[in-house]
Design a protein with these regions (language model features):
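Short, structured segments at the rim of ligand-binding sites
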Residues: 1-427
Length: 427
């Protein structure tokens, strides 16, 4: 295991390149199954969730060739299994996308209940609702999810809640189903559109992605293609917070400013200056941080994945801020870590009330999940002195080369191996 050792208290200045979108990559990689041929996927982030997805494809029988650090050729012509191993399924929540892709191509798929971050209940009932609307049967036994169908037929699905995962899984299952599928009350995030674009490049007929109704006309077969994944707007937002929390000056390259608008608006509201270019953003802060009210919502609202980072930033705002979590039930588990640093935060259910303090103090910290871990890193960068962040495996799931990128911006941060005997004593 590793930890990060961070000496904070200095502004971060410089340029950073943003990698491919994690939430698009973990759906697009399973989608290559539908091609039954070769796909060249570019701008893949080098993160553990992507590596796990590639390993799953390999275990299913795909032939995978690494072209460069961010480009892979994937040939799914000769898959010989429709069951994802328990170990790999439980490494990441997004393993459930293999259900939709395997069901769509082979009429059968099986994965273990997925792992990933513990943010409260993440039921798959909306995924299964879509599959059954297409004529599939499902069973959940002994932690295994199995879906099967002799003949998939398009259907009309109105999702009870807006779910990114269910929307994408339904798209994967429907593109090869006979007839027309209509999906209503769907998620509209940029990675939904990216998946639709990729499916269409492979020969699918998907319309309406980015709106709340998606229409899919089933096709008989699909083919391989070359595709480049969109930039990760959450990674970009994280480095914007890094500039804001350290009074820095950071220019982000390889971004789509339109995708950043909900984040950019809030950072401007707290007192940051943001300049927009064609594929870049520059963020600076010189004055005091201002408090604000924030509620996470489905896109185009403020993204839940940015909530822990904004909460960390608002601990230093002058006045009272209120943050309401509108997506996940258990997303404030990290707050105690910020309180250890001197933050003044009261949590009542889904609402956090933050009284700004003048400074955060260094402390031993724990990454309770992916985005909370990133928030701990940003808080440590703002605190004068040395902090340590444990359980960084969560952070590496979603941030490519985060230590190296922060070092290039002037951060004093390094990875340190934790001896096995120290880990066992902690357990």
């Amino acid at each position: 295991m590793e930890k990060y050792v961070i000496r904070g208290g200095k502004p971060l200045v410089g340029d950073v390149n943003i990698g491919g979108a994690k939430n698009a990559a973990v759906a697009i990689l399973p989608a290559t199954i539908l091609a039954g041929g070769k796909c060249l996927i570019e701008n893949l982030p080098c993160i553990s969730d992507v590596m796990a997805s590639l390993q799953i494809l390999s275990e299913l029988g795909a032939n995978i060739r690494m072209v460069s650090r961010s480009t892979y050729e994937i040939d799914t012509s000769h898959l010989d299994s429709t069951e994802v191993s328990n170990e790999l399924s439980r490494q990441m929540r997004a393993s459930y996308y293999f259900l939709g892709a395997l069901l769509g191509r082979f009429g059968s798929g099986q994965v273990a209940m997925p792992g990933g971050c513990n943010l409260g209940p993440r039921p798959i009932d909306q995924h299964l609702k879509a599959f059954t609307a297409f004529g599939a049967e499902d069973s959940v036994e002994y932690g295994q999810i199995h879906v099967r169908s002799e003949h998939l037929v398009g259907g009309h699905v109105f999702f009870d809640t807006v779910s990114v995962g269910a929307t994408m899984n339904a798209m994967l299952a429907a593109v090869l189903a006979e007839g027309t599928t209509i999906l209503e009350n769907v998620a509209r995030e940029p990675h939904i559109v990216d998946l639709a674009n990729f499916l269409n490049m492979m020969g699918a007929d998907v319309h309406g992605a980015g709106t709340d109704v998606i229409k899919i006309h089933g096709v008989k077969e699909m083919h391989g293609c070359n595709y480049s994944i969109i930039p990760d707007h959450i990674e970009a937002g994280s480095y914007m917070v890094a500039a804001a929390i350290t009074k820095g000056d950071i220019t982000l390259h390889n971004v789509i400013p339109k995708h950043m608008e909900p984040i950019t608006a809030k950072l401007r509201a707290v007192g940051c200056e943001v300049e927009e270019f064609d594929d870049a953003l520059r963020i600076t802060r010189t004055g005091e941080l201002k408090p604000l009210k924030l509620k996470t919502m489905p896109h185009p609202g403020f993204p839940t994945d940015m909530q822990p980072l904004m909460t960390a930033l608002l601990t230093l705002a002058k006045g009272t801020s209120i943050v309401t979590e509108g997506i996940w039930e258990n997303r404030f588990r990290y707050v105690d870590e910020l309180i250890h640093m001197g933050a003044n935060i009261q949590v009542d259910g889904q609402v956090a009330v933050i009284e700004g303090v003048k400074e955060l103090h260094p402390a031993p910290l724990r990454a309770t999940d992916l985005r909370a871990g990133a928030a701990m890193v940003m808080a440590a960068l703002a605190a004068n002195g040395v902090s340590e962040v444990d359980e960084t495996i969560h952070i590496e799931r979603g941030y490519e080369n985060i230590v190296e990128k922060l070092q290039a911006l002037g951060a004093d941060i390094r990875r340190v191996e934790i001896p096995a005997n120290a880990v066992s004593r902690a357990i």
